[in-house]
From Swiss-Prot:
NCBIfam families: argR_whole, PRK05066.1. Pfam families: Arg_repressor, Arg_repressor_C. It is found in: Cytoplasm. GO terms for molecular function: arginine binding; DNA binding; DNA-binding transcription factor activity. The gene is argR. One of its GO terms (biological process) is L-arginine biosynthetic process. The lineage of its organism: Bacteria, Pseudomonadati, Pseudomonadota, Gammaproteobacteria, Enterobacterales. This is Arginine repressor. The keyword Amino-acid biosynthesis applies. Belongs to the ArgR family.
Length: 156
């Protein structure tokens, strides 16, 4: 197998292991990769890969400190449309919630506020990566949700 293909296979295996969120030490990751047939892997290589892919230690569902990869976020470019900053749109009985790339919520909220009541938006509250939007009088939350989906060309 070519070394670049072997490297790609190693990266895939490494990322798959971290997605399991059960490895609390670099040594455990080394052993798991060796068990998958990557004999030449060592702690130093795992450490470099953790840094390269931005892995962090965090608590999993069992409250154990484990290594995991951050959510893969598309970094916006000067030519990318705003819709690429919107990651998810959902709603309940009261508000529409929009999740964005980190740092983009206030920009998207300002756009929504500029559309105003005529488009069904009473107002928005934005944090770093989350927006709460409430419908204007005469609009249902579902109507607002569908209008925002259409605006950002998201799938239902």
């Amino acid at each position: 197998m070519r070394s670049s293909a072997k490297q790609e296979e190693l990266v895939r295996a490494f990322k798959a292991l971290l997605k399991e969120e059960k490895f609390s030490s670099q040594g455990e990751i080394v052993v798991a990769l060796q068990d998958q047939g990557f004999e030449n892997i060592n702690q130093s290589k795992v450490s470099r890969m953790l840094t390269k892919f931005g892995a962090v230690r965090t608590r999993n569902a069992k409250m154990e400190m484990v290594y995991c990869l951050p959510a893969e976020l598309g970094v916006p470019t000067t030519s990318s449309p705003l819709k690429n900053l919107v990651l998810d749109i959902d709603y309940n009985d009261a508000v529409v919630v929009i999740h964005t790339s980190p740092g983009a919520a206030q920009l998207i909220a300002r756009l929504l506020d500029s559309l105003g009541k005529a488009e069904g938006i009473l107002g928005t509250i934005a944090g770093d990566d989350t927006i709460f939007t409430t419908p204007a009088s005469g609009f249902s939350v579902r109507d607002l949700y569908e209008a925002i989906l259409e605006l950002f060309e998201q799938e239902l």
